[in-house]
């Protein structure tokens, strides 16, 4: 039977990734989350902007101690762009990568190679990002106690974002002279996000004297508003069925 909702499709994407069938997974992802030149409030779109010298922009980030970068979990391009930032930012002393989906094994300490494990590492581009960091002597930290919130039956979103910020704060305070890149999904890295207080805002509240910047690299990736039409496209044109 045809897919009835997006959860069924996301479940299939997860299964394909677990089986190593990344080509089929990517085909579905690229149909479900198409790129679109989204309009801004002033009526402009991405097509109206002129190219910039990215090296000049990266130099401006040198004044910050913490850079928050968000990931679009089902859109692999966001990992490539983050890898690009990582490559340049390490030259400015950002030698600590804190990643979502990886739980810390030892409190406040960088993970050893054999300790790096997590759900998103099943996706090749996420693994590529972590592999690059390890090979370039960038410390990997986990900060995500996702399942702790589920097991305690708390408000999962509020619990998770606040706990992420608590763990990041602890890592930063133990390494006060270091610089950090925090890689988190979707709106977790924002300062405000609809009616949810995200990790980025908690972190700013917890570290008021620390210079923090949030880079939203996903603004022009078409998001949830277009997913229902994408669902129809998947069912009608690709003839996809549930397992």
How should these model regions be labeled?
Residues 1-243:
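Compositional signal for N-terminal targeting/processing segments
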């Amino acid at each position: 039977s045809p897919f009835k909702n997006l959860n069924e499709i996301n479940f299939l994407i997860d299964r394909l990734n677990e089986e190593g069938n990344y080509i089929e997974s990517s085909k579905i992802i690229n149909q479900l989350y198409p790129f679109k030149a989204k309009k801004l409030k002033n009526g402009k779109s991405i097509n109206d902007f002129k190219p910039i010298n990215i090296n000049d922009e990266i130099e401006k980030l040198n004044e910050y101690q913490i850079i928050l970068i968000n990931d679009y979990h089902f859109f692999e391009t966001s990992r490539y762009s983050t890898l690009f930032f990582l490559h340049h930012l390490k030259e400015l002393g950002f030698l600590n990568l804190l990643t979502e989906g990886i739980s810390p094994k030892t409190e406040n300490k960088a993970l050893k190679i054999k300790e790096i494990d997590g759900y998103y590492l099943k996706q090749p581009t996420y693994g590529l990002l972590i592999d690059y960091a390890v090979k370039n002597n960038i410390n990997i930290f986990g900060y995500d106690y996702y399942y702790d919130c589920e097991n305690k039956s708390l408000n999962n979103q509020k619990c998770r974002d606040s706990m992420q910020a608590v763990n990041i704060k602890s890592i930063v305070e133990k390494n006060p002279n270091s610089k950090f890149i925090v890689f988190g999904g979707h709106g977790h890295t924002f300062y405000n996000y609809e009616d949810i207080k995200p990790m980025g805002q908690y972190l700013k509240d917890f570290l008021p004297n620390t210079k923090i910047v949030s880079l939203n690299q996903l603004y022009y990736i078409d998001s949830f508003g277009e997913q229902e039409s994408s669902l129809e496209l998947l069912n009608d044109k690709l003839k996809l069925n549930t397992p």
